Amino acid sequence: MIDFSFSIYDLEYFLLIFVRVSCFVYIAPYFGMNDTPARIRIGISFFTSILLYETLTPADAVVFDTVMEYAVIVMKEAIAGLLIGFGANICMAVVNFAGSIADMETGLSMATLLDPATKETTSITGVLYQYSFMLMLIASGMYRYLFGALADSFTLIPVNGVVFHADSLLQSMTEFMSDYILIGFRIVLPIFCVILLLNAILGVLAKVSPQLNMFAVGIQLKVLAGLTAMFLTTGMLPGAADFVYQEMKKMVVSFIGGMM
C-alpha cells in the first residue's frame, strides 16, 4: 500500500529543496532571462522540486530549534542555488563581451540596443551572439546537464550540508576571469584579424594618396568587412559554443566543489 502521509517535517524539507532549485532557475542561463514569465520559472522550480523530493532520501541533518535557525538554513540553500546558477550564467557573459569587441572593431559600437533579456543597453552583435548561443544551448541539450548538475548537488551537498569554502570559490573565479578575455577574443578572432588587415591597408593608402578621406571611407569599409567576416564565420559558432559550454561545466563543478 502506498503511503501518502505528509508531515510538517516533510514540508520543511521540501521547502529547502524548493529554495535551492528556485534560486538556481532564477539566475540560470535561458531560464533566468527577464523576459521569461515568472509563472514559468515558478512552475519549473516547483515540479523539479517535487521530482527531487520523491527521489532524494530525507537527511537527518535538517534539525533546528528556532525559526532563526531555519531561516539560516534557508539562506544557505538560497546562496547554494544562486552560486550554481551563477557559475553557468557567468560563462554566457563572455558572449556579450565578444560581441562588444566585434562592434568596437567594426564601428557598430555607436549603435546600441536594449537587450530584452537583461533590460540593459548592449551591443548589437552581443545580442546576436547571446541569442545564438542560447538557442544552441537548448538545441544541444546543455540545459539537461545544468539540471543534472543541480540534482547531483543534492547528493554531494545534502540539504543543510552546505559548507562554503571561500578560498576554493575565489580560486575558481580567479581562474575563470583570467581566461575571460582570452575566450572572448577566441570567438571574435576572425573578425579582429580582418579589421586589423583592413586598417593596415587603409594606412598604406592614406600615405600613398593623402588627398583621399580615408576616415570616411574606412568607416564604411569596416562595417562591410566586419559584417562579411561575421557572415562567413557563422559556421564556427557551434564550435565556439561547445568551448563555452565546456567552460560552463568546469565552473559549475568547481562551484559545487567549493560548497562541499
Where are these regions (language model features)?
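Hydrophobic alpha-helical segments and their helix-loop boundaries in membrane
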Residues: 1-260
